[in-house]
């Protein structure tokens, strides 16, 4: 696991998670990498920027894995 990101709430949106993990610079970049199918959630490509990511989910992008913790 490359990164663990701690969230306060029950979930975080996929685009926000990528920004919080410093894997993208802004929401526009997050939108493009997600809609281009470059991001996986729990091993499956997800092209929804508003996808809710919960504790225990694993997000993969650009050779890095992020685990969401609370």
Regions found by a protein language model. Name each.
Residues 1-12:
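A detector for short, charged/polar N-terminal pre-domain segments
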Residues 3-4, 58-70:
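A positively charged, amphipathic N-terminal helix/segment that binds anionic biomolecules
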């Amino acid at each position: 696991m490359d990164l663990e990101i701690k969230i306060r709430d029950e979930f975080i949106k996929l685009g926000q998670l990528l920004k919080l993990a410093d894997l993208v610079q802004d929401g526009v970049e997050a939108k493009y990498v997600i809609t281009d199918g470059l991001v996986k959630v729990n091993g499956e490509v997800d092209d929804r920027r508003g996808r809710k990511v919960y504790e225990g989910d694993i997000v993969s992008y650009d050779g890095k894995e992020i685990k969401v913790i609370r």
